């Protein structure tokens, strides 16, 4: 109800400053009775996916709470799952500012954040303090200064540290803002990474006597042939799920709008159709052999339903949450 007024004030600020201000307030009320102000009552709509029981099909996508600072505050809003990160082995500042831009007319965002985060050890400490009752996903990536050829070592190091605390682990190989990262989506590089991840997963399962599923997050900027190859690799390596999709480099729907020429990944409404089409193609290729988590431009009940009709078992929001506020969570969970 009040979000349009809050949004109006926040949108007067630079996008990253607005984000930092909001997170400071959320962090401040976490663990206090004031968290009740954020609590939304949503119906239970259980979904079984990747061997896990989600209390409802709506999740928060990675990138909003990179360091796991506000898990409980965000959880109070009714999400069935929250994906924190992307986190890297070592802290890194990310790219130079400004690096986040609103395309207000299109309800889109362009970001070139560059995996800015305080490192995996810091994230684990924050996760330990949280009390979220839903499924917590931890999204992992590689440090910018780690050569792509050695990138798998970063993923394995993160897996080692987050395994005990994650409901599932998301492997981010599709951000456009870390040089060379998307090359890990193809051919031998992908097979090599997935084989190493499955070996590490088996080793950690034995060590912790608990199986934590692994999902791979892919880009929307893939040809049909590339998508077929990726689907084949995911099935062959028995990956537990696929998150489709990350942000796009395509600007065709925002041409001529303010900030459209900024480099980085575009998310929000302009990504909606593109990501849904990837999900549709992926679903046709996978034939139910592994589940799809649909993300990209979901800003309404209809957009969420479209993702699920295209083949997604679960859906996630991020940009729509920025533009529509917490009410979107309740609306989607109530009607999906």
From Swiss-Prot:
The gene is pyrD. InterPro entries: Aldolase_TIM, DHO_dehydrogenase, Dihydroorotate_DH_1_2, Dihydroorotate_DH_2, Dihydroorotate_DH_cat, Dihydroorotate_DH_CS. FMN binds at residues 62-66, 86, 139, 172, 217, 245, 268, 297, 318-319. Binds 1 FMN per subunit. Belongs to the dihydroorotate dehydrogenase family. Type 2 subfamily. Its cofactor is FMN. Monomer. It catalyses: (S)-dihydroorotate + a quinone = orotate + a quinol. Its main location: membrane. It is a peripheral membrane protein. The lineage of its organism: Bacteria, Pseudomonadati, Pseudomonadota, Gammaproteobacteria, Enterobacterales. This is Dihydroorotate dehydrogenase (quinone). Its EC number is 1.3.5.2. Pathway: Pyrimidine metabolism; UMP biosynthesis via de novo pathway; orotate from (S)-dihydroorotate (quinone route): step 1/1. Keywords: Cell membrane, Flavoprotein, FMN, Membrane, Oxidoreductase, Pyrimidine biosynthesis. One of its GO terms (cellular component) is cytoplasm. GO terms for biological process: 'de novo' pyrimidine nucleobase biosynthetic process; 'de novo' UMP biosynthetic process. One of its GO terms (molecular function) is dihydroorotate dehydrogenase (quinone) activity. Substrate binds at residues 66, 111-115, 172, 177, 246-247. The active site is at 175 (nucleophile). PROSITE patterns: DHODEHASE_1 (PS00911), DHODEHASE_2 (PS00912). It is found in: Cell membrane. Catalyzes the conversion of dihydroorotate to orotate with quinone as electron acceptor. It comes from Edwardsiella ictaluri (strain 93-146).
């Amino acid at each position: 109800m009040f979000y349009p007024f809050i949004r109006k004030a926040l949108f007067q600020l630079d996008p990253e400053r607005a984000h930092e201000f909001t997170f400071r307030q959320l962090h401040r009320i976490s663990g206090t009775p004031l968290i009740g102000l954020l609590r939304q009552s949503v119906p239970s709509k259980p979904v079984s996916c990747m061997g896990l029981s989600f209390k409802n099909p709506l999740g928060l996508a990675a990138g909003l709470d990179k360091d796991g600072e506000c898990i409980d505050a965000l959880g109070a809003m009714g999400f069935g799952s929250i994906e924190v990160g992307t986190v890297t082995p070592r802290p890194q500042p990310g790219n130079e500012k400004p690096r986040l831009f609103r395309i207000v007319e299109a309800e889109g965002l362009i970001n070139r954040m560059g995996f800015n985060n305080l490192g995996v050890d810091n994230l684990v400490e924050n996760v330990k303090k949280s009390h979220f009752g839903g499924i917590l996903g931890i999204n992992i990536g590689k440090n910018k200064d780690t050569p792509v050829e050695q990138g798998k070592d970063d993923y394995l190091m993160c897996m080692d540290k987050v395994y005990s605390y994650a409901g599932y682990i998301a492997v981010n190989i599709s951000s456009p803002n870390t040089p060379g990262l998307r090359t890990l989506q193809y051919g031998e590089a992908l097979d090599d990474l997935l084989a190493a991840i499955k070996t590490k997963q088996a080793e950690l399962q034995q060590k912790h006597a608990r199986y934590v599923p692994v999902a791979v997050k892919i880009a929307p900027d893939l040809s049909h042939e590339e998508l077929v190859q990726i689907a084949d690799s995911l099935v062959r390596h028995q990956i537990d799920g696929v998150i489709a999709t990350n942000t796009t480099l395509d600007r065709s729907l925002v041409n001529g709008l303010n900030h459209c020429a900024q480099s980085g990944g575009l998310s929000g409404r302009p990504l909606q159709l593109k990501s849904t089409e990837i999900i549709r193609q992926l679903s046709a290729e996978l034939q139910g052999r592994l589940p799809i988590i649909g993300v990209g431009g979901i800003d309404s009940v209809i957009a969420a339903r479209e993702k699920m009709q295209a083949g997604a078992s679960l859906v996630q929001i991020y940009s729509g949450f920025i533009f529509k506020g917490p009410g979107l969570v309740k609306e989607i969970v109530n009607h999906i």
